[in-house]
Amino acid sequence: MNPVELPAPAADRELVAALRQDLLAAEFTNERVAQLLGADALAAMERDQLVPGMLRIAELLSTDGTPDPCAVLAGLWLLGLDIPAGQLQAALPRLGVEGLRRLNLVHPAAAERPTAEAHGTPGADDAERYRPSVDLRPYQAEQEQVLVDLWVASDLPAAQLQGPLHPEHVLGIGGASLTLAASIHRTPVQRALEIGTGCGIQLLHLLDHAEHVVATDLSRRALDFTEFNLVLNAPALRLDPGDLGARVELVQGSLLEPVAGRRFDLIISNPPFVITPRPRGEQIQARYTYRDGGRAGDELMAELIGALPEHLTDSGTAQLLGNWEIQDQDAWDARPRLWCAGFPAEVDAWFIQRDRQDSAQYAETWLRDASTQRDPESYRRRYAEYLEDFGSRAVLAVGFGMIFLRRRSVDAGSAEARAITPWRRFEELTGAVEQPLGPVLGATAARAESAARDPQAVFDTVLAVAPDVTEERHQRFGAVHPEVILARQGAGLRRSRAVSSAAAGLLGAADGEYQAAALITAVAALMADESTDQEDLEQALRSEVLELYVEGYLSES
């Protein structure tokens, strides 16, 4: 079954303005949709199961009189139902069916597609029914510290299609995009860059705190979706729909090529990092542009990570998602460490591995993502290609995670620049975290820079145990002393780490009354004995306190 590519939405300013007014009048928002569908149907939709929602919408649309406009739009765009023209006209009176067609948002239905009538809605001829050409759904983003209702258009999701995705598929709101949005440390910046913008979800957030944003994508189709979404949400984003270029620059091209020689205060990306076999005779047009950058293995990530520092301003940061090949189960970070090996000393790097999959699991994940299983012969062939490809590089697994880079602001050639110790952190945190993570990541990186720049200043600071930190002791029954003492965070990254008895004593005494240096001296004096020198204990405690401070177990009082 060949995938079908539908036209991208048109960004006609007058028609989009009419659509915006209709969506507002229909209250087509997350809150209203949740009220209409109910918790069970919403939960099923998150699992790509549409039947409960279809049944609920059929019930709502079968009532006498004019149907609820929000129910009509939810049935059309969230559930992929074929909707009678009269109901669409009533739900979107300013734009109308003709306007919907001119914007490429709907097209005439075919008999084999699901209809509301199949679930009890009064009928109409197929010629009078329309089906969605795009996925258009409510979204919320913070603008000037207030959550505002927005809408995001993208290609139809796999659950609404009958075959594999088209190679030029434009992805919509998904888990990865939401994870990235929640992980960005948001501070006011002049210039921001998004690499691989897709349908522009991240732009909706960036425009709240960036004066000017450049968004790149290899796909012209993706940029068309992005332009449509910007025009549709222009008033909420403080954009002039007639002059998007005043704040937004949409550029077609691969990765950083379109911005050669330019620097940015913030760079973010959910890049096309998916590792894909490169079989002999592969056709470029068969690649999934939204996820496949055309390189072998994880070379795209290596290329992108290696080039990012030269595009960062002083104090500039880059945050992205990515994955990396693992050839040694005990050294998941070998590839990320290699990518950072050539960084200047003033560039900090932090990799957090959130998940890992063995090679077979990885293949299955991305074959399902493209709905390849709907063509069994193609699925088996592509699965074999994945395993052969991983085997050729002795890849055992693939790690997924978040990446945070920052260029410190130092004068090149200065004594400070020469004395810099790079902050390179690689940690595996696969447990639940508290979102949004952005403030936590930003604060951690700032503390790391402070500790590296002037550790004595940390010791001269009054520190207290963070309010979410608890102590956990493990010991055998009847034992006098614990064998393991853990400090556990209840918020943010929710780390847990083993601490020494001395550090546990210091944490117990860190109530915000004393400088860290005084606590270190007092605890070391109490715990020193014939076998433990006080000076050695103080030195060990100083190192441990710096780590506890950077990781957020200790905070400034």
List each model region and its residues.
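A general structural signal for short secondary-structure junctions and capping/turn motifs
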Residues: 142-144, 290, 310, 392-397
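Short beta-strand micro-motifs in enzyme catalytic cores
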Residues: 150, 399-403, 484
